[in-house]
């Protein structure tokens, strides 16, 4: 509880220092906190009830949504705060944090503005490749060492990354719902 409180305090401090205008628009704050709470609850639920694997959850959707409606810096910081909160309930938080941060950065950098669906396909593909590359590096460091025995690779994880990328494609229709719910306008509509 203390860890989550400190992270949220840091996030609020960032908003107060650099994004005071978000306090004027209630939709901005509502969107940010709704996304943080949503991803944290989903992660805790999946870990507690041992449902699938958390790598199926499209965490990169969070910075994409915030990037489209707000800005890149806020998208990155919100993503970092959410990933750190979600990592509390995991068995291997270090691997999770590095993988998700890399995927989130790729999602932010590959998507300047979302005006066509093809941009989201490209972003989803880049996110999948990032997940796979980071996880492959982890596997080389931990499981295989420097050997080239690829039969020891955990193929299931790569399947989770592909499912994650497919779920990431649902960002586009979700943006319409979020626009109506929180009162935003974007280039998507």
What are these regions (language model features)?
Residues 16-26, 37-189:
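Generic detector of multi-pass transmembrane helix bundles and their immediately adjacent loops
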Residues 2-18:
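Selective detector of the "anchor" transmembrane alpha-helix that sits immediately C-terminal
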Residues 28-34:
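Loop-to-helix transition at the N-terminal end of transmembrane alpha-helices
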